[in-house]
Design a protein with these regions (language model features):
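NUDIX/MutT-family hydrolases
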Residues: 96, 104-137
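Conserved beta-strand and immediately adjacent loop positions that scaffold enzyme active sites
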Residues: 11, 37, 111
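Short connector loops at helix/strand junctions that flank enzyme active sites
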Residues: 7, 35-40, 69, 88-92
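Conserved N-terminal beta-strand and adjoining loop/helix that marks the start
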Residues: 1-22, 41, 45
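Active-site-adjacent beta-strand/loop module that shapes the phosphate/pyrophosphate-binding cleft
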Residues: 7, 16-18, 76-104, 134-137
Length: 144
């Protein structure tokens, strides 16, 4: 019997200076969540760390560009059945960071995927479930 895990994650919808989404093409490696899928930059929260501190740290580690905490806008929270790993549970906080200069990034995990907003739907089948959740919240916020 496989023991279920509870993950605590913070990730960001990152938008460049031209309004494009900066997404992570995840490595095709056994053992990582949503291997080969398109994800958001972010990751696991460390003990004693707030979700905002987590997203600042994780995004910096993964894209090599520091985004100050006051530049992150909270998008949506999720707490329930794991979106990306069957049988697990998760709490995830999603943020938005805007006006990020794509030419200053140095992606260290996976590869950078720059997507025009009107092309995102064509990648729907490649998006990790957590990305679909965050993008639906983002689209809903744009309509409000």
């Amino acid at each position: 019997m496989v023991k279920s895990r509870h993950r605590e994650i913070a990730s960001a919808v990152i938008i460049d200076t031209q309004g494009r989404f900066l997404l992570q093409q995840r490595d095709q490696v056994p053992g990582i969540a949503q291997s080969g899928k398109i994800g958001l930059f972010g990751g696991h929260r460390e003990v004693g760390e707030t979700y905002l501190e987590c997203v600042v740290r994780e995004v910096y580690e993964e894209i090599g560009y520091f985004i100050a905490s006051d530049r992150f806008e909270h998008l949506v929270s999720y707490n329930g059945t794991e979106l990306d790993i069957d049988g697990d549970t998760m709490r995830s906080e999603f943020f938005i960071a805007r006006d990020i200069p794509v030419d200053e990034l140095n992606v260290t995990e996976g590869s950078l995927l720059v997507v025009e907003p009107d092309k995102l739907a064509t990648l729907e089948h490649k998006l990790a479930p957590s990305v679909r959740f965050a993008m639906q919240a983002f689209e809903g916020r744009k309509r409000d």
